[in-house]
Amino acid sequence: MHCRIPDTQDTHRLGGIGMTSQRTRNRLIRRLQANGIRDTRVLETMAREPRHLFVDEALAHRAYEDTALPLGHGQTLSQPWIVARMTELVLTARPRRVLEVGTGSGYQTLILARLVEAVWSIERIGALHQRAAARLAMLGADNVRLRHEDGGHGWPQAAPYDVILLTACASVLPPELLAQLADGGELIAPLEDDAGRQWLTRVRRCGITFERTRLERVRFVPLLEGVIQ
């Protein structure tokens, strides 16, 4: 498939310069392609959107490296390859309505918002929730609804969802989340096995049963309970 990578004359009202320039972003996109990311919608969206706005200014020069970056509060901004891969998996279900558990910086939320009809996203850490809300508002992501809450409870008022995406690793999936999947819907999550290894996993709802498929090894921060103001 051909992915249109923007040239350096393309403009973005929040584009960067130097290590945050379009040329630097395009280099990241080529690396993602080389590492197996194929969905052109994902690649073009990630080429366009300003990842450097989702980290502290001191780390902005590293925003287009294929690496995770710290957000504070024991959380990280996921490696771009992981964001791309998880977004690809979300899109295979052709969803209209997506629930994200773990807003974090809001970057994954933004990529989803550009590609699906509506996104609901929950964050348990108040400071991260507030920063993500400000960034997403600035970028015009008006199809996103945010909540400061324990993500393990989901967002039942807006259920059911075509896809639920967890951005932290669970050892046991909260039954409340599974109950909020539409029939035929999918949950994409890093799950821990009995040996402590993490696997990116697809869980598909078929009536009252849930089919699990392990995809690949990953490394995420743990899914925690409770709310931090």
Curated annotation (Swiss-Prot):
- Indicate where this protein resides in the cell: Cytoplasm
- Which biological processes are named by the entry's GO terms? methylation; protein modification process; protein repair
Chief subcellular location equals: cytoplasm
Q: What's in the keyword line of the UniProt record? A: Cytoplasm, Methyltransferase, S-adenosyl-L-methionine, Transferase
Question: According to its UniProt record, which residues of this chain constitute the active site?
Answer: 78
Q: Which PROSITE patterns does this one have?
A: PCMT
GO MF, one annotated term: protein-L-isoaspartate (D-aspartate) O-methyltransferase activity
**Record-listed E.C. numbers:** 2.1.1.77
Query: Which SUPFAM superfamilies does this chain map to?
Result: S-adenosyl-L-methionine-dependent methyltransferases (SSF53335)
Gene Ontology CC: one annotated term = cytoplasm
Reactions mediated catalytically: [protein]-L-isoaspartate + S-adenosyl-L-methionine = [protein]-L-isoaspartate alpha-methyl ester + S-adenosyl-L-homocysteine
Please list the disulfide bridges: none
Q: Which Gene3D superfamilies match?
A: Vaccinia Virus protein VP39
The record's listing under InterPro entries reads: PCMT (IPR000682), SAM-dependent_MTases_sf (IPR029063)
UniProt enzyme class: transferase
Pfam family of this protein, just one?
PCMT
Q: What is the protein's known function?
A: Catalyzes the methyl esterification of L-isoaspartyl residues in peptides and proteins that result from spontaneous decomposition of normal L-aspartyl and L-asparaginyl residues. It plays a role in the repair and/or degradation of damaged proteins.
Q: List the NCBIfam families hit by this protein, alphabetically.
A: pimt, PRK00312.1
To which protein family does this belong? Belongs to the methyltransferase superfamily. L-isoaspartyl/D-aspartyl protein methyltransferase family.
Q: What is this protein called?
A: Protein-L-isoaspartate O-methyltransferase
Please name the source species. Chromohalobacter salexigens (strain ATCC BAA-138 / DSM 3043 / CIP 106854 / NCIMB 13768 / 1H11)
Q: Which gene encodes it?
A: pcm
